[in-house]
Swiss-Prot record:
GO terms for biological process: attachment of mitotic spindle microtubules to kinetochore; chromosome movement towards spindle pole; establishment or maintenance of microtubule cytoskeleton polarity; meiotic centromere clustering; microtubule bundle formation; microtubule depolymerization; microtubule polymerization; mitotic spindle elongation. Keywords: Cytoplasm, Cytoskeleton, Microtubule, Phosphoprotein. InterPro entries: ARM-like (IPR011989), ARM-type_fold (IPR016024), TOG (IPR034085), XMAP215 (IPR045110), XMAP215_CLASP_TOG (IPR048491). The modification Phosphothreonine is found at T279, T650. GO terms for molecular function: microtubule binding; microtubule destabilizing activity; microtubule plus end polymerase; microtubule plus-end binding. Residues 250-297, 562-678, 809-833 are annotated as: Disordered. This is Phosphoprotein p93. Its main location: cytoplasm.
């Protein structure tokens, strides 16, 4: 009796409106099922006979109640054996997959997973698989993802010997066609697991139904998968020691594979958790006869190029190829382009004109079908990597079409386009394609601007050559405009580009190119630049320095060298020569200089003097004669001609002073000369006039530098003024627009008022005409009513007067007055009666009046009391007079 009462109480409580009552009912049921030994217990009987009762708890809206219901079902299936499973399998699978498996609570998901495993092991696998394949195709992403995870778990636990792969072959292409990235990610995991069981049969059945990029990503993932065989009742679940990178087709986020390292006596293996459910670890067995097929990389770089044979790609451009490209069916166009992929993937091409092929690709990049665009981007990637620098003449053909497709929102297509753009950058460099890139920063589509800025930022970080000055000015001016764009991704991408430029050129150099930048945004740019690493720097020499060349003002170079005398083993043996050397040294080391000479110029002059007149070392084989060199300079016609030329260039050509200075500066050079088998050293000297000329040139250079600094400040001031004027112009335009809007609004109001005025004037004229007609009619009626006949009326009045006298004598005065009134108002003829009837039966109007009020006194009273304005009455009187 107590158990019967318990069952009846539970069955009544699970349908209660209060969630607490339902929670307590399932909690009590769970305790009772845990205490029971098998399905012979009485608490199992209601649920075996009526398994539809489980739907109430599995679909409960309260999460704790649902959790206890799922746990009770798991315990029921575990202890009721085959009898309970057979009764409940057709009722509980659908609620478990729809409500419990996608639940946000982990305990509910685990209990649901365990319940489904029990059903699958108890000869109810067909029900479970049928429900899972149906739930994996639903539109609800969470339910579909949970079902795919459960399928993956069942495939790992039972394997292909127990599960048929054919339903999986039909399901996987459908999953890859879904728009949700999580569904496609789980489809990739399921494909990896299925490939481990069936091998190349997966490619045969599934790859023809997938996109090319999906096939490539799956093949890259299949590299690390090993076969799975059943050994001793254990399911193998092993991967190579390399990490599995799962593909992502429509998400910018990179998925993180759930990999855990495990050490064992047999070696280190990586076990991948394909679902969020807890599954026991199983023993890993190595494959016996299985070899995964090598993956085909889409943009893999060419290897062994030196030994590769050039491929004739242009021979594939047959008339059939062009016919297929012009087909209205997108599949024909896609197949035509795919036929070129194996040929174009070769690393070396034969020499030829590839403009026709690239025009075909550029046209395909504009195709309406995104699949065709993806294949065209793949072809462009292969061609750019194969041609390398030879691709430079064709950049103008494909770059506009390539950048214009950045407007696509499908991330997989954008990734393919970015791969092609990266291949072009690696082949041609950034500076050669900078002009085409900057044009698309002015595009009207914000998505195009965003992706172009992001790609440009990556190129600036990777390139080792600084952009030229003209491109830098254009880029900075565009960035100053785009950083105030209304689209947030454009602003963020522009900020990153400016941060990269700051890291390359430094803030002081870049500040003169971003004059109009908002000062509030500069700190963020500087903060971002600290975390950016670049390879290009402006002070980094891009090419080795060439030796100095003579000035173009001279027809032939002049060597300021003195032929030395015979070498002397003891330079100080000749006292006259030594004294002359000291005198020359004192004369040349302390020349008379202007007061404006800088310290740097003095040090350079001293260095020249000391380098030209110092005594030779002991290892020298000859010594120069200072006296002879001092005397030889004035007598040399070439030197005098050179000085005259330099003075003329200083006076007449101020812009070429640096060239003159380079012509006048002659550094010491050692020139080996063979004369009788001996080498002699030539020393280059400089005269006082040359030193003075050099100081003048340096002063001119300093003055020019000061002028350039002033010009830069003036330029910056003008830029700021231009910016202020532009802001004022924009404000004035806005004010003018507001005023024009106000004026147009007032004009509309005036027009409406004029129309209302015309309508009221017309109505007033109509009212006046109606009043005039009514007034004339009333006057005629009044004249007829007041008209009394000369005969008949007097007789009646006399008769009435007699009767009145008689009645007055009898004292009935009231009747007399009444009789008089009735006589006075009685019509005298038929015409009078008709006039009165017409006056009384006429249609009343707003201004109609009774006929007895048309006497002068009644008219005045009516005019004062009636609701008619005095102005209207005056108008009526004037119209009557007229």
């Amino acid at each position: 009796m107590e158990l019967d009462d318990f069952n009846s109480r539970i069955l009544s409580q699970i349908f209660d409106k209060s969630w607490k009552v339902r929670f307590e009912a399932y909690e009590s049921l769970l305790h009772a099922l845990n205490r029971a030994l098998d399905d012979s217990d009485v608490c199992f009987q209601p649920w075996i006979h009526d398994p539809a009762l489980w739907k109430q708890g599995l679909c409960d809206s309260n999460v704790p109640t649902q959790e206890h219901a799922v746990k009770s079902l798991r315990c029921f299936l575990d202890k009721s054996r085959q009898k309970g499973v057979n009764s409940a399998k057709s009722f509980v699978v659908a609620p478990l997959l729809e409500k419990c498996l996608p639940s946000p609570r982990q305990s509910i998901r685990d209990a649901s997973h365990q319940a489904l495993l029990i059903l699958a092991k108890s000869d109810a696998l067909d029900y479970v698989l049928e429900g899972l394949f149906s739930a994996a195709r639903v539109k609800h992403p969470k339910q579909a993802v949970a079902s795919i995870k459960e399928l993956n778990s069942l495939l790992e636990n039972f394997g292909i010997p127990a599960l048929s792969p054919i339903p999986f072959y039909k399901l996987i292409p459908t999953l890859f066609a879904q728009s949700d990235k999580n569904i496609r990610q789980e489809a990739s995991n399921l494909s990896i697991t299925l490939y481990a069981w069936v091998g190349n049969a997966f490619k045969t059945h599934v790859f023809p139904q997938l996109k090319q990029i999906q096939v490539s990503d799956l093949e890259a993932s299949f590299q690390n998968v090993t076969s799975r065989t059943t050994t001793g009742g254990h399911i193998s679940n092993s991967l190579n020691t390399q990490e599995v990178v799962l593909p992502s087709f429509s998400s910018n986020a990179k998925p993180k594979p759930h990999l855990s390292s495990k050490s064992s006596s047999q070696g280190n293996t990586l076990q991948r958790s394909t679902s969020s459910f807890s599954t026991p670890n199983r023993k890993v067995s190595q494959p016996s006869d299985f070899s995964a097929s090598p993956s085909r990389s889409i943009v893999s770089p060419a290897k062994n190029i030196v030994g590769s044979t050039p491929v004739d790609v242009l021979s594939k451009l047959t008339p059939e190829f062009h016919t297929a490209l012009s087909s209205p069916k997108w599949k024909d166009r896609k197949e035509a382009l795919e036929s070129m992929v194996p040929v174009c993937s070769n690393p070396v091409y034969q020499e030829g004109d590839y403009s026709e092929l690239l025009r075909v690709i550029a046209k395909s990049l504009k195709d309406a079908n995104v699949v065709v665009v993806g294949v065209a981007a793949l072809l462009l990637t292969h061609i750019a990597k194969a041609l390398r620098k030879g691709f430079l003449p064709y950049t103008g053909i494909v770059l506009p079409s390539l950048f214009d497709r950045f407007k696509e929102r499908k991330s997989s297509l954008v990734h393919s386009l970015l791969d092609a753009a990266n291949a072009i950058f690696e082949s041609c460099g950034l500076n050669d394609i900078m002009d085409e890139t900057l044009e698309f920063l002015k595009h009207k589509n914000p998505q195009v601007k965003t992706e172009t800025l992001r790609w440009l930022n990556r190129c600036l970080q990777l390139t080792d050559v600084c952009p030229p000055r003209a491109s830098l000015e254009t880029l900075c001016s565009l960035c100053v405009t785009l950083i105030n764009d209304t689209f947030e991704p454009v602003r963020m991408a522009t900020t990153n580009v400016l941060a990269t430029l700051v890291q390359i050129f430094s803030q002081p150099v870049l500040s003169k190119y971003i004059v109009g930048l908002d000062p509030k945004k500069l700190p963020k740019i500087l903060e971002l630049s600290k975390d950016i690493t670049v390879n290009a720097h402006p002070n980094q020499p891009s090419r080795p320095r060439l030796p100095r060349v003579a000035s173009p003002l001279k027809t032939s170079p002049v060597k300021l060298a003195v032929t030395p005398q015979a070498p002397s083993p003891l330079p100080s043996s000749n006292p006259s020569q030594a004294s002359l050397t000291e005198e020359s040294l004192s004369t040349r080391s302390s020349p008379t200089k202007p007061s404006t000479t800088s310290l740097r110029s003095q040090s350079l002059v001293n260095r020249f003097a000391s380098s030209t007149l110092k005594a030779p070392s002991s290892s020298s084989k000859g010594v120069s004669n200072a006296a002879s060199s001092k005397q030889s300079f004035p007598s040399s016609p070439s030197i005098s001609k050179k000085l005259e030329t330099s003075r003329l260039s200083t006076k007449k050509l101020p812009g070429s002073t640096m060239k003159a200075a380079s012509a006048l500066k002659e550094y010491p050079q050692q020139q080996s000369m063979k004369s009788g088998g001996e080498k002699q050293d030539n020393l280059v000297t400089i005269t006082m006039s040359e030193k003075v000329e050099l100081d003048l040139l340096r002063e001119e250079k300093a003055i020019r530098q000061v002028q350039e600094a002033e010009d830069a400040l003036e330029r910056e001031r003008l830029f700021r003024e231009i910016n202020d004027l532009q802001i004022q112009n924009a404000e004035m335009k806005e004010q003018v627009y507001e005023k024009e809007s106000t004026i147009s609004q007032k004009e509309v109001e005036i027009t409406s008022l004029r129309n209302e005025k015309d309508r009221l004037s017309t109505r007033l004229q109509q009212v006046l005409l109606e009043l005039e007609k009514q007034h004339e009619t009333n006057e005629e009626a009044m004249d007829i009513d007041l008209k009394v006949p000369e005969s008949g009326a007097i007789g009646r009045v006399t008769t009435r007067a007699t009767a009145t006298t008689a009645m007055d004598e009898s004292g009935n005065a009231g009747m007399v007055s009444s009789g008089i009134h009735s006589v006075s108002t009685k019509p005298s003829s038929y015409g009078t009666r008709r006039s009165l009837a017409g006056s009384m039966l006429q249609k009343p109007t707003q201004f109609s009046r009774p006929s007895f009020m048309f006497s002068p006194e009644a008219r005045d009273n009516w005019r004062e009391s009636h609701d008619l304005s005095s102005h209207l009455w005056e108008q009526i009187q004037r119209m009557k007079k007229a």
